[in-house]
């Protein structure tokens, strides 16, 4: 029975990974520009996003496996859950976590930078002429990646030798004493994880909070579309007015623009440019309404119009969910600030939850029927992931408030896609801490595990609460009953994260106060967005229309050149045959 249960849990995780591959593939396909696709960039981004999401979604598997050893109805371990069996489960989880975290670090710090420089070093002309070989390109990309290799080495060396916190503020609790690691290898990995979460926290605060606030509002208050009839009518009126003014100016000079004054010539040139822009807008409006397009596209546009009210309903539901998440995070943050037994000395670890958290309660109840909690957790992670993408798309990739790259559907360059992937990886690492320690701390640590708060007379014997159900209590780190340590098994994920904050308290302080900054940024953005009406970005629309026109001209020119070349080669062949 135990083997069947654990096998089913891992099967659900495998199905989730397959779903993640599909989600990552769709994300990359939707955002990358069609005319500048690179297989190496596409595969790297898909693999990196899948790996990191798989790391986060390992948490419900972790909770389900450790909870499977405990009978929450009786508050005791199941008969098959001997120390040997429990240690086997914990060891397998540790191996998977170490593998995924190491892979995440390598992808973010080495593979993505190398792929970036590999793409940058490509010279199409030199490659066609044979001047650039694969070896030359590899060495050029590797030379730039050496800097990142040095960063990784320095990072692990610092983590290897940096002093850890001493056992002065653990309150004498065995659970927290065990987290003070003396293994230098684990210390280096713990330090590296803490540093990456700290960097990701900055991105998480800026982008995820913004996206979480704007994603529901964008569904509720949709910006005007180019396909709207009133915008099309306005464009037609502006075009008629433009052409009428051109006729007036041309009538003054009888068709000879040299007779016009310099002011009128400048105005006429401006009107001609504006006319081209308005014609492009009109063509985009016609295409958006389905004119001149296939019946399938017209059917899709009509279906989209029919389901528009459901889009509004979905936005309202997402807004309510986001507000509940915000309230849950605020309640846990206040609980940590007031009831943490060691405060800043251990990164505000909360030994026992005293304030009700609605999201945490939902997860603990759902965890009793696996995989209900897994489905809810996956949806929660995907909500945060989509919010991060929306935040990056709206804010853009910036350096000192200067936008370097813009992330847009169908217009994202390979370089921007790689940078976005690296940012998402760091953001999701910070999300892993936030979900585990703030959004649902009880669920992420012990899940639905309980213990019988009754002393036993015999060493190794489990307490029996079958006739005293009121003594069955949820597991927590601050349990004073020594018998509970043999019943309650904390998740590996919570152990890793608590080890970071226990060994390096300054990381824990940054993580904790970063949650308040996240909550503040979310509140400011959501209030501002509710009072601000969305507008159509005409400049961006004109750039898209101009780009589409250029691509159409290039395609038609290429077809004409191909036809002319075929005609020439065909005539020469006929002359040889004759």
Swiss-Prot record:
Probable lysosomal cobalamin transporter. Required to export cobalamin from lysosomes allowing its conversion to cofactors. Its main location: membrane. The chain crosses the membrane at residues 8-28, 46-66, 95-115, 145-165, 188-208, 312-332, 347-367, 375-395, 419-439, 506-526. The keyword Heme does not apply. Pfam families: LMBR1 (PF04791). The lineage of its organism: Eukaryota, Fungi, Dikarya, Ascomycota, Pezizomycotina. It is a multi-pass membrane protein. Belongs to the LIMR family. LMBRD1 subfamily. Residues 539-578 are annotated as: Disordered. InterPro entries: LMBD1_LysCbl_Transport, LMBR1-like_membr_prot. The keyword Transmembrane helix applies. This is Probable lysosomal cobalamin transporter. It is found in: Lysosome membrane. It comes from the Eukaryota. One of its GO terms (cellular component) is vacuolar membrane. One of its GO terms (biological process) is protein localization to vacuole. Glycans are attached at residues 70, 168. Keywords: Cobalamin, Cobalt, Glycoprotein, Lysosome, Membrane, Transmembrane, Transmembrane helix, Transport.
